[in-house]
Design a protein with these regions (language model features):
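Mobile genetic element proteins and their domesticated derivatives, centered on retroelements
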Residues: 34-36, 75, 81, 100, ...
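Acidic/histidine-rich, metal-coordinating catalytic segments
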Residues: 111-124
C-alpha cells in the first residue's frame, strides 16, 4: 500500500529539518549519518533448486518453508559515501542500540553525529539505556543529534537507497534459511 502524507505543519517542519541537515557542507566534527532497517523473511527451499545449464535457466520451486524473520540495518554517511550494512536476528531495541553503539564508535572525534532516521518505536534513548545502562546508554545517545523523518516521509532517509540497492544486489530473489547465511552474504556484499 502506498501512503500519501498529509502535508501538515509537523510534516513540513520535520522534512525541512532533514533537508537542512543534508544541505550543510561536510564537517568531520559533525557528520550526517542516515540509519534505516528492513525486516527479512527467512525461507528455506523444500526441494533443491536445479542449477542453470547451457541453454536452460535455473529452476526453483515456488514452495518454501518459513524459517522466521531477521533484520538488516543500513547506515550511510551521504557526504563521504561510507556505509555499513549488517544483519541481525531480530528487530529490537537492543539490536538498534548495538547498531547505534557501532556507529558512534566509527566517529570517535565527532562533536556530535547528526543521525537521520524514522520514528520507529525502538529508535529511542530508552533502547540504549536498556541495553547499555543509564551511564553508557545516555552517553551514546548524547553523542547524537537526532533528526526524525516525518511519518510517511521515509523517502527523505538516504539509508533507504542503501537498503534498496542491498535488496536488489544482495537479496534478489534468493532464499535465506537462517540469519547466519544472511549475515555472511550481507558481509560479502558490503565488501
Amino acid at each position: 500500500m502506498w501512503c500519501v502524507a498529509e502535508l501538515n505543519q509537523q510534516y513540513i517542519r520535520k522534512m525541512e529539518d532533514v533537508l537542512a541537515v543534508y544541505e550543510k557542507p561536510y564537517d568531520a566534527a559533525q557528520p550526517v549519518v542516515c540509519l534505516d532497517e528492513k525486516p527479512i523473511a527467512l525461507h528455506a527451499d523444500v526441494r533443491s533448486p536445479i542449477p542453470a545449464k547451457p541453454g536452460k535457466p535455473a529452476k526453483q520451486d515456488n514452495e518454501y518453508e518459513r524459517c522466521g524473520t531477521a533484520n538488516v540495518f543500513g547506515v550511510v554517511e551521504p557526504k563521504t559515501g561510507r556505509h555499513f550494512t549488517t544483519a541481525t536476528p531480530d528487530r529490537s531495541g537492543a539490536e538498534f542500540a548495538r547498531m547505534v553503539g557501532y556507529v558512534v564508535k566509527q566517529y570517535p572525534f565527532a562533536k556530535t553525529i547528526h543521525l537521520v532516521m524514522d520514528n520507529l518505536n525502538s529508535h529511542t534513548r530508552n533502547s540504549l539505556i536498556n541495553c547499555y545502562g543509564e551511564q553508557e546508554g545516555g552517553y551514546l545517545w548524547d553523542r547524537l543529534t537526532v533528526h526524525y523523518t516525518p511519518k510517511h516521509g521515509s523517502w527523505l532517509n538516504q539509508a533507504e537507497i542503501e537498503l534498496s540497492m542491498y535488496s536488489r544486489q544482495c537479496l534478489g530473489k534468493r532464499r535465506f534459511p537462517d540469519v547466519n547465511l544472511l549475515r555472511r552474504e550481507t558481509q560479502a556484499w558490503r565488501g
